Amino acid sequence: MWTSYDDYIDALKAIAEPTRFRLIRLCAQGELTVSELTRIVGQSQPRVSRHLKLLQDAGVLESFREQHWVFYRVTQDMHCQKLVSELLEQLPADGDLMVLDQARLNELRGARAKLSEEFVETEVPDWLRLHEYHGDELRFSGAVKDALSPQPVGHLLDIATGTGRMLKIAGPLADSGVGIDLSKKMVMVARNALAEADLPHLTVRQEDMYQMRFPARHFDTVTIDQVLYFAADPDALIKEATRVLKPHGRLLVVAFTEAAQAKSPPPVGIVISDIRRWLEEAGLTVTATDVLPGDVLDISLLVSEKNKERA
């Protein structure tokens, strides 16, 4: 991050300007586009863009492009996060501009939430309807946390994140994280879910799960939640997940498997031996397995570790 005294002073100088401080406060609460920030602070787009560039050059903000938009958020470096957090904690929240900014941000979030809700209700993919087979959500969340808790989650990747459900469960355990989905509408839904859950250290990107733009050995933990039976090539998916996993990193696969005493034909399902085979062929070693029994479908959770020789 800041490698010298001068870099640190430059960052403080960039922050110490009224409009830029407002922008930092907003970006600390989630990912926002230039046009959204322009509407909130009530200034021209060129002026806001200039402020954002100065903050990014100083290492306080970072940005990423998605389609025609550029999103900004506070840099995820822990030193920057600590500095921004300490500054914001001392900021009186009852100032007129702070109140107005927050009201406009809340209004924007409300509009986002409405769009997300309408999309989920009218165009939701069939696989989201399978959530009814999860039974007790608290039990499922607990099983995921137990599966991941033996060691730090670190930098997290959730593949085909959908509504962002896995990010909301595992995200609080992670230092930072990314959810990816090919659908730009599902990215919108997941991004809204993270904002509502107050998880600003997580982000969502539109990506092809078979050809992710992340470098090799980039993540400490990768999750694949209820995706394999809809994947055209699950073997290739697991190999791509392994590529971006650090040596000794962990992959958590969650999948429906047919219940031992199923009361009716399962709508989907996958044979657990196939999952094990795909994991082993990708250079992973299964270290833990948990099964949550159900009436029609069991939920199987498999944790595997990347072998060092595949680094």
Regions found by a protein language model. Give the residues of each.
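Conserved class I S-adenosyl-L-methionine
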Residues: L252-R276
